[in-house]
């Protein structure tokens, strides 16, 4: 993990690097997944077939599942402590939650996803891979979701929403001092500037930008890291009735 404070500094990490000590993507894959590489490979196979067939990923993603999706997600594990309780908000096809669970079996991972077709896929994948991962169909803003999954140490997300919405959804699911880890793109500082006041009003503190995987990825991953303030926490409004899981 590297802390960055400007676009110039971020560019020095996220531009393509040619000499990282790894000749192929698969060397980085082996470093990250190690003895669980066969599980990661099976997940890639499921994404490339069932995932694309059901429209969870576009067909053009099939040839870049390892570098663009699995590695991009799994390197966030650099920011997680042993045994962390993690919720993946808007998990979609299981990103970043499933790569994290594969790379770090010590984590307690919940995949939170509102759409039935995605939830069905996620439950099939979890069963197929034999992962100790819970899949919950629901939205982060629903009160029963917090009751179901409890207060988490970390809320992760990838390509889900802007930081104001992510903060609103994440804070009620976190313990005091818990972390929000949002994988973001090249306009991250503009987004922070735009939403910082709203984030602070919702209880987010210590907002920073970090990059993960700088030692072994050609394009390290940009993550917004912020914490749930100790004193200010908002409970979600009750939305609808409890859904059948």
From Swiss-Prot:
The keyword Secreted does not apply. Its EC number is 2.1.1.-. Its main location: cytoplasm. InterPro entries: rRNA_ssu_MeTfrase_G, SAM-dependent_MTases_sf. GO terms for cellular component: cytosol. One of its GO terms (molecular function) is rRNA (guanine-N7-)-methyltransferase activity. It is an enzyme of class 2 (transferase). S-adenosyl-L-methionine binds at residues 90, 95, 140-141, 158. CDD domains: AdoMet_MTases. Keywords: Cytoplasm, Methyltransferase, rRNA processing, S-adenosyl-L-methionine, Transferase. It is found in: Cytoplasm. It holds the Pfam family GidB. Gene3D superfamilies: Vaccinia Virus protein VP39. It comes from the Bacteria. Belongs to the methyltransferase superfamily. RNA methyltransferase RsmG family. Specifically methylates the N7 position of guanine in position 518 of 16S rRNA. This is Ribosomal RNA small subunit methyltransferase G. The lineage of its organism: Bacteria, Bacillati, Actinomycetota, Actinomycetes, Mycobacteriales.
């Amino acid at each position: 993990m590297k802390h960055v404070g400007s676009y110039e500094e971020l560019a020095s990490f996220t531009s393509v690097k040619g000499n990282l000590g790894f000749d192929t993507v698969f060397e980085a894959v082996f470093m990250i997944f190690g003895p669980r590489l066969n599980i990661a490979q099976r997940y890639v196979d499921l994404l490339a077939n069932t995932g694309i067939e059901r429209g969870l990923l576009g067909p053009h993603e099939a040839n870049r599942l390892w570098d663009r999706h699995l590695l991009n997600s799994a390197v966030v594990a650099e920011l997680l402590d042993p045994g962390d309780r993690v919720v993946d908000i808007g998990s979609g096809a299981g990103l970043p939650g499933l790569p994290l669970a594969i790379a770090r079996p010590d984590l307690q991972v919940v995949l939170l996803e509102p759409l039935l077709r995605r939830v069905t896929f996620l439950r099939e994948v979890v069963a197929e891979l034999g992962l100790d991962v819970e899949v919950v169909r629901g939205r982060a803003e629903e009160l029963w979701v917090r009751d179901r999954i409890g207060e988490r140490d970390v809320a992760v997300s990838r390509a889900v929403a802007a930081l104001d919405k992510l903060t609103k959804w994440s804070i009620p699911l976190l313990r005091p001092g818990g972390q929000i880890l949002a994988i973001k793109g090249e306009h991250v500082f503009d987004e922070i500037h735009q939403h910082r006041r709203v984030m602070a009003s919702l209880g987010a503190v210590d907002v920073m930008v970090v990059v993960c995987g700088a030692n072994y990825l050609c394009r390290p991953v940009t993550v917004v890291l912020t914490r749930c303030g100790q004193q200010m926490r908002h409970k979600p409004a009750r939305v609808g009735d409890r859904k059948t899981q």
